[in-house]
């Protein structure tokens, strides 16, 4: 099992606690992935971080549930062997009460290929008490 998936390991999203140490998955994004109905992400950045963790853990159910219905694909297929290497949140902008943007860089590596960076500015909307990923522009 990869270290990022071990119980007690730091959250794959890389968020740091007040002590400057990585938060455990259960105290960070795990609470959103494992209790979707009862614990919605409080802001667009938290949702984006939890969606990154859902990619790391191949949680298509969470990714689809947090994708806005206007843009949601019918299914998600994960590329076999992809290793997610890290996430850097560059900016979180609250545009108004129901719209936000998050700029981030996620790194991944596929078997037999060099590592790649996904640089995206994602758009989010808040509806019915939840944040949803709408779409994004890659750079």
Curated annotation (Swiss-Prot):
Alphabetized InterPro entries for the sequence: NTF2-like_dom_sf (IPR032710), UPF0225 (IPR023006), YchJ-like_M (IPR048469)
Pfam families referenced in this protein's UniProt entry, alphabetically: YchJ_M-like
Family assignment from sequence similarity: Belongs to the UPF0225 family.
Stated name of the protein: UPF0225 protein Bpro_4182
Organism, as annotated: Polaromonas sp. (strain JS666 / ATCC BAA-500)
UniProt lineage: Bacteria, Pseudomonadati, Pseudomonadota, Betaproteobacteria, Burkholderiales
């Amino acid at each position: 099992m990869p270290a990022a998936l071990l119980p007690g390991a730091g959250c794959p999203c890389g968020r740091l606690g007040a002590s400057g140490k990585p938060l455990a998955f259960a105290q960070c994004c795990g609470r959103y992935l494992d209790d979707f109905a009862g614990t919605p992400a409080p802001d667009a950045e938290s949702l984006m971080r939890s969606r990154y963790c859902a990619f790391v853990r191949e949680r298509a159910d969470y990714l689809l549930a947090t994708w806005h219905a206007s843009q949601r694909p019918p299914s998600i297929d994960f590329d076999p062997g992809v290793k997610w290497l890290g996430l850097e949140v560059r900016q979180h902008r609250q545009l108004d009460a129901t719209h936000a943007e998050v700029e981030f860089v996620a790194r991944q590596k596929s078997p037999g290929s060099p590592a790649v960076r996904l640089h995206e500015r994602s758009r989010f909307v808040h509806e019915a008490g939840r944040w949803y990923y709408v779409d994004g522009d890659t750079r």
